[in-house]
Design a protein with these regions (language model features):
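Subtilisin-like serine protease catalytic core
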Residues: 35-42, 75-200, 228-229, 272-276, ...
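Extracellular S/T/G-rich loop segment that most often corresponds to the catalytic His/Ser-adjacent loop
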Residues: 93, 267-341
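Catalytic-core regions built around general acid/base machinery
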Residues: 228-254, 268
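Loop/turn elements at helix/coil->beta-strand transitions in domains of secreted/extracellular proteins
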Residues: 85-88, 179-183, 213-219, 244, ...
Length: 410
């Protein structure tokens, strides 16, 4: 079997294809947030609204350009008090622009290496100077986009911002995990045509083992692949099914993308039957599952926003709009991390968090998607949100009662 894995990331078919082609070459990144403040080019999908929320000065959110934040109840996770122990989210992607204004204060930091000596493996984990993660493509600590990725918009930068974009920093956007998530950047795929740019099982296994060893509690996979190996299966089983090998280790959850490119089966890692797999099913702001969405195995499957999503870019404007199942995965990852970092759930291990928060509360929400047209989801799926766990409301659009969705900002 070919040892390379086809790493696939799709666009949502409900919107013009041109809106998916935002990855244009650029030389610099604007931090003004000007692009994020403008009306969205897909505003026909998302009615414009000004958010009266004093908890953030991010213009993208306040101007109504981040419909998905309140859609998942993300603003309920924001607090005036610092989170004592943010949840580490391992992002498996093409890297991330660590200097971006939305990310530079929202990255996981390996303190031993950050405060150690350059060129020395200060923490003895086998990786030198791995301050914010590791580049498994070029096997070095620089996790920013490399090679042919430089100057492009960067898929990983966009995903990282949907997980944990910094709130209230006077820039463009905020994320559900702004307070409670920190992103560990694991560069596992490149942008060019070189053999080493392709995702392969050995690299994924190394990255999974690294993330588990370094304390990641949410593993975010916005891509999918159709083939696997016994070794890769075993690595995912260690992370998402087996008890933690280390006493006191809370364990980890894998958030997997359910693609919307017309394939019959969801592919890996969504296809794994492991008990700590949570799947993101792409939906629009109308509660409709994206056409072409693959069938997901039974389990913890949640509808998560995919269309007309504003996020950070490594390109000139600093921000861009994207549509697709990747967005659903990153948004769900940030939401889960933000919940897990908040009281009283921060003390839970992975299995207890899944049982008491995700399965017993989130999956019992009264908000569900509509059934899909192909019949793969005849009862729809529960919509991902924090409202069943909410103790307060931040704006009129958050946590509406059943039957009020038509008045909700979308």
């Amino acid at each position: 079997m070919d040892r390379a894995i086809r790493f696939s990331i799709g666009c949502l078919a409900l919107v013009p294809a041109a809106l998916c082609a935002q990855s244009t070459p650029a030389q610099s990144t604007s931090e003004s947030g000007e692009f994020a403040c403008r009306p969205l080019s897909c505003s026909t999908l998302v009615p414009s609204r000004t958010v009266d929320d004093k908890s953030t000065n991010d213009c993208g959110y306040r101007n109504g350009n981040e419909w998905w934040v309140d859609y998942v109840g993300g603003s309920l996770l924001w607090s005036d008090k610092p989170v004592s122990k943010p949840v580490i989210v391992a992002l498996f992607d093409d890297g991330a622009l660590t200097s971006h204004v939305e990310l530079r204060n929202r990255l996981w930091t390996n303190e031993a290496e950050a405060n150690g000596k350059p060129g020395i493996d200060d923490d003895g984990n086998g990786y030198i100077d791995d301050i914010h993660g590791w580049d498994f493509v070029d096997d070095d600590p620089d996790v920013s986009p490399q090679g042919e990725c430089v100057g492009r918009a960067s898929h990983g930068t966009f995903m990282a911002s949907l997980i944990a974009a910094e709130r209230n920093n006077g820039a463009g956007i905020a994320a559900a995990g702004s307070d409670g998530a920190r992103v560990m950047v694991l560069r596992v795929v490149g942008c060019g045509g070189r053999a080493k740019d392709q995702l392969n099982p050995e690299r994924l296994i190394r990255a999974l083992d690294y993330a588990q060893k370094m304390g990641a509690r949410v593993m975010s996979f916005s891509a999918h692949w159709s083939t696997t190996t016994p070794e890769l299966d075993a690595a995912f089983a260690r992370v998402a099914d087996a008890p933690s090998p280390n006493p006191g280790d809370p364990g980890a959850i894998v958030v997997a993308s359910v693609p919307n490119k017309g394939e019959a089966a969801a592919g890996y890692p969504a296809a794994y039957p492991f008990r700590r797999i949570v799947r993101a099913v792409p939906i629009g702001n109308d509660n409709i599952i994206s056409p072409g969405t693959s069938a997901a195995p039974p389990g913890l499957n949640f509808g998560s926003p995919s269309a007309c999503v504003l996020g950070a870019s490594a390109g000139t404007l600093g921000y861009r709009i994207e549509h697709g199942s990747s967005n659903s995965t990153a948004i769900l990852s940030g939401l889960l991390a933000g919940l897990w970092a908040s009281a009283p759930y921060a003390r839970f291990g992975a299995d207890e968090f899944l049982a008491k928060v995700v399965r017993d509360r989130m999956s019992r929400t009264t908000r569900r998607s509509q059934p899909d047209l192909r019949g793969d989801y005849p009862k729809g799926v529960p919509l991902a949100d924090a409202c069943t766990l909410a103790t307060k409301r931040r704006s009129a659009s958050v946590c509406l009662e059943p039957g009020q969705e038509q008045g909700r900002s979308q």
